[in-house]
Every structure is written in structure tokens, then in C-alpha cells.
Amino acid sequence: MVFFPHRHLIGIKGLTEQDITYLLDKADEAVKISRQREKKTSTLRGLTQINLFFEASTRTQASFELAGKRLGADVMNMSVGNSSVKKGETLIDTAMTLNAMRPDVLVIRHSSAGAAALLAQKVSCSVVNAGDGQHEHPTQALLDALTIRRAKGKLSRIIVAICGDVLHSRVARSNILLLNAMGARVRVVAPATLLPAGIAEMGVEVFHSMREGLKDADVVMMLRLQRERMSGAFVPSVREYYHFYGLDAETLKAAKDDALVMHPGPMNRGVEIASEVADGPQSVIAEQVEMGVAVRMAVMETLLVSQNQGPRSDGMMA
């Protein structure tokens, strides 16, 4: 029997191909549960999950909440807007307070890179990173991988083009790490102003033209233009950005005929993607949302149940 040797899920970095495959296989089982009429199980009955979101989120928080409830856990959502953090309490103080309540898992989203890793050092329960600044978003990468694997039958040797605001995207970083670990060929397509320094060292091919970057791609993954994280003029205008880097039906023709179109959401229609593509036959954006619940069910079950069945490290995969 294969065991998952980690206590927390802080990032994709540090996960092996075997670890990733284990979680994806477990998520495949969760998909079956989610498609049943009776979706609730007793796997995590008696265990407590706290969702601690310091950044606004709709789909991710709802997905984690639904995942926990389908596994039978008691789920509590912490509203930061009404919390002691607004009164000056530090993240560490908050962590210590929550730890005293003896939860079994804390799910955290925070605007600062490293927040999840810091929390994991201060609490006695498992920690799941739901996105920390521009660092990582591991469950998003896992759900994207599950979506691709279910559609294409594999992850190895496929060509994935990640397009758009790579600089500010934790989704891009986690996907690059995961796809490389699984043997995919990864491309990034963006203007130079929206690419981090040293991006090529992450094992990707860099393109500044959509048509060139999408040529023969099996998967086209569009990223939102994250204007809320921009302090300067990274693009001349939204209109010009869409002209050169937006995905419409004509641009998509550069990819393979059966290429998947993906987007982590929320989408900016007419900014990075056209509605004709987002709602078109090659889009698997709705499937990504469905796979998100399954992946988070798999992560929760693995950390809270499987970890007690074999050797485990306290490595945080940061």
C-alpha cells in the first residue's frame, strides 16, 4: 500500500510524481461520490475543518466547504472582516487562538507568500494552502491536472500553454511545478512585463506570441489579468492586451483541434478570453470547478485519515 508521507499541503514543490498520482487517483474516487444522489460520507465524521480566508474568495472557499461537508466533517468558515485580525491581531496570534480550539485541519488563504507555511509551524493540526500571495495554489494545480488527465488520459508528454499574467499568478507557479513533475511540456505565453525574472529556469519554454505559443498545444490555460496586484502599468491598455494576448476562436486555431481550454477563474471576458471560447465545445472550465471539490475531498481525506496509516514526515512541501 502506498502512503502519503506529508502532514500539510503547502505547495506542489516537494511533492513527488508518486504523491501527485496518489492524490489524483484518490480524487477520481471522490468524483464518483460527488456524482451520486447521496453525496455525504462519514469519512471525517467527528473531525473539524476551519476555513480561514484573508482574501475574498467565492469558488475556492465554497469548494473547500463542500468538500469537508461531503466527507462528514464539521466545517467552520472564519470571516476575517469580523475577526480580531481587523483589530490588530497578528497571524501568529490568530493561529494560536485557533489551535487552542483543537481543529483537525486549517485551510488558509492569505495575501502574503509564506503565510501557510508560517501557520503550519505554529499549529498542531494539518494545514492546507488555499493560496498565499504570488507563491502557490496547490489544490488549483491538482484540480487542473485531474481535469486534463480525465480528458486526455495522461499528463506526460502533452503540451500545455499557460497564457497571460504569469508574473502575479500563484496558479501558474503551482501548475508549472506539477506539470513538470508529471512529464508534460510547459510553455508560458505573455508579454515580457508579465513574466517573472528567471522563468525559463523553471523548465518552461517562453513565448511572446499567442500563435507561436499555442502551436500544436494540447491544453491552453488562460490566466486572469490581476490588476489588483499591479502597482504600475504592466500593459498599455486592456484593449491592447486583449488584441495581442486574448484568446478568441481564431487564435485558438493555432492549438490542436482537440485542445482543451482552461481558466482558473474568475474570468474577465473580453480581457483574456472571449465568450465564444469560454463557452465553446473545447472549454472544460465547468469541469475544473467540479474537479475542485473532488481534489479537495481527496486532500482532506489523505491528510486526516491516510496519514495515520503509515510513516509520515512533517515536511511542509513549501
From Swiss-Prot:
Carbamoyl phosphate binds at residues 59-60, 109, 137, 140, 265-266. GO terms for biological process: 'de novo' pyrimidine nucleobase biosynthetic process; 'de novo' UMP biosynthetic process; amino acid metabolic process. It catalyses: carbamoyl phosphate + L-aspartate = N-carbamoyl-L-aspartate + phosphate + H(+). GO terms for cellular component: cytosol. Pathway: Pyrimidine metabolism; UMP biosynthesis via de novo pathway; (S)-dihydroorotate from bicarbonate: step 2/3. L-aspartate binds at residues 87, 170, 224. It is an enzyme of class 2 (transferase). One of its GO terms (molecular function) is amino acid binding. Keywords: Pyrimidine biosynthesis, Transferase. Heterododecamer (2C3:3R2) of six catalytic PyrB chains organized as two trimers (C3), and six regulatory PyrI chains organized as three dimers (R2). Belongs to the aspartate/ornithine carbamoyltransferase superfamily. ATCase family. This is Aspartate carbamoyltransferase catalytic subunit. The lineage of its organism: Bacteria, Pseudomonadati, Pseudomonadota, Alphaproteobacteria, Hyphomicrobiales. The gene is pyrB.
